[in-house]
From Swiss-Prot:
Subunit-level organization: The complex is composed of two ATP-binding proteins (CcmA) and two transmembrane proteins (CcmB).
Gene (name only): ccmA
Family recorded in the similarity comment: Belongs to the ABC transporter superfamily. CcmA exporter (TC 3.A.1.107) family.
Protein name (Swiss-Prot/TrEMBL): Cytochrome c biogenesis ATP-binding export protein CcmA
One GO cellular component term: plasma membrane
Matches recorded under Pfam families: ABC_tran
Swiss-Prot/TrEMBL GO biological process terms: cytochrome complex assembly
C-alpha cells in the first residue's frame, strides 16, 4: 500500500502555453485533496501526469510505501486506479463480466465485486451488456469497479458528475471508507467532494 505521493515543482504545458508551473503537493495515507481551477487550467492534465500518462514539462512525481520510495512504474501499475471523464468500460461485455474482470485484474475478488454491485444498486443490471446501460448506469458501474479494487491511490476526474443525490451519497460513503482505511484520493472537481479534503488551486 502506498503511504505518500510527492509532487514537486510540477509544470504542464500544452503546445507553447504553460498551463501551470511550480506546483507542489504531498498527499499522505488517509488524505484527500481536490484540484480546483478554471476550465483549461490543467486539472485533468495534472491527474494524467501523476498517472504517468502525460510527460510534464518540469518537475517530478514520487511515491512511497511503508518501507520508503517505490519505483514510479511499479507504484502506478500496482497501487493506482484512475477514473476519468470516460468510464473506460468494454461495451461488449455484460456489466458483471466487466466488473468481475476489472476487479480481479486490479487484485480484488468476486466477493468485493458483488458487494460493490449491491452498493451501487447494479444487481438487476449485471446481465445487461454495457452498451445497453445509460450514462448514469455506466458511471455507477465504473464507481463499483473502483470500490471493489484494493488499490490505495484513486485519481478521479469529475467523479460525481452524472450521479443523482442518492448515488452521490453512496459514493461519498465509499470515499470516506477508503481514506479511513489509509487510502488516498486526488480529484479534479467543480463541486466539493462530500468528504473532508484540502483544496489545491491549479493554474498558471
Amino acid at each position: 500500500m502506498l503511504r505518500a505521493v510527492l509532487i514537486k515543482d510540477l509544470a504542464i504545458s500544452r503546445g507553447e502555453r504553460t498551463l501551470f508551473s511550480k506546483l507542489d503537493l504531498t498527499l499522505r495515507a488517509g488524505e484527500a485533496a481536490t484540484l480546483v481551477g478554471r476550465n483549461g487550467a490543467g486539472k485533468t492534465s495534472l491527474l494524467r501526469a501523476v498517472a504517468g500518462l502525460l510527460r510534464p514539462a518540469a518537475g517530478s512525481t514520487a511515491f512511497e510505501d511503508a518501507n520508503g520510495p517505490v519505483e514510479a512504474d511499479t507504484a502506478r501499475a500496482e497501487h493506482l486506479h484512475m477514473l476519468g471523464h470516460q468510464d473506460g468500460l468494454k461495451s461488449s461485455r455484460t456489466a458483471w463480466e466487466e466488473l468481475r474482470f476489472q476487479t480481479l485484474w486490479t487484485g480484488g475478488n468476486e466477493d468485493s465485486a458483488r458487494a460493490a454491485a449491491q452498493r451501487f444498486d447494479l444487481r438487476r443490471l449485471l446481465d445487461l451488456e454495457v452498451r445497453r446501460l445509460s450514462a448514469g448506469q455506466r458511471r455507477r458501474l465504473a464507481l463499483a469497479r473502483l470500490a471493489a479494487s484494493p488499490r490505495s491511490l484513486w485519481l478521479l476526474d469529475e467523479p460525481m458528475a452524472p450521479l443523482d443525490a442518492g448515488q452521490r451519497a453512496a459514493f461519498g460513503a465509499v470515499m470516506a471508507e477508503h481514506v479511513a482505511g489509509g487510502g488516498m484520493i486526488l480529484a479534479s472537481v467543480h463541486d466539493p467532494l462530500p468528504i473532508p479534503a484540502r483544496s489545491v488551486e491549479v493554474g498558471a
